[in-house]
Amino acid sequence: MAALCRSHAGTAGSRFLRALVFSKPLRNASTESGSESATHDSSAPRARSGGFASALERHSDLQRKAELRLESPKPVESFASMLRHSPLTQLGPAKDKLVIGRIFHIVEDDLYIDFGGKFHCVCKRPDVDGEKYQRGTRVRLRLLDLELTSRFLGGTTDTTILEADAVLLGLQEIRDSKSREEQPSK
């Protein structure tokens, strides 16, 4: 019986709170009547609204800004158009393409190189000038395959090792510095 009284008292209390909250106008809330808005001077300092009122004002401002953005929409580009103009599609068949990548990870003599494709490639560190191949170094690559996949005997799906296949050609910075040295001597 006590549980029933508590639940009934809780609903009565919540009804009372709802009536109290929604019957009173919010302080500092603007009204639509012209006489009251005329008495407020725009240059007079506004009283700082608290809690719910300030949250409501911020939310209303965000809604107004969102509506303004919707009124002036940017031209929407279709997925087909974005795909057609993407650098990966412009590349064409990947076999024997020369690209520039950046070394982002090194494990012993394995260089993990990101060249902007779907997957990165792993190349061995060369014996000559191997100490120059550090993280962040830009290198030249010749792509062999963008994704190493294979269909195993009896399998119905391709299995990938999430890597691309490429041959490391050398450092990009050294090639750039040589061309810079040749230009002033001409």
From Swiss-Prot:
It comes from the Eukaryota. It is found in: Mitochondrion. InterPro entries: Ribosomal_bS1m. Pfam families: MRP-S35. The modification N6-acetyllysine is found at K132. The keyword Iron does not apply. The modification Phosphoserine is found at S72. One of its GO terms (cellular component) is mitochondrial inner membrane. One of its GO terms (biological process) is mitochondrial translation. Keywords: Acetylation, Mitochondrion, Phosphoprotein, Ribonucleoprotein, Ribosomal protein, Transit peptide. Residues 1-70 form a transit peptide. Residues 29-42 have a biased composition (Polar residues). Residues 29-50 are annotated as: Disordered. Its main location: mitochondrion. Belongs to the bacterial ribosomal protein bS1 family. Component of the mitochondrial ribosome small subunit (28S) which comprises a 12S rRNA and about 30 distinct proteins. This is Small ribosomal subunit protein bS1m. It comes from Mus musculus.
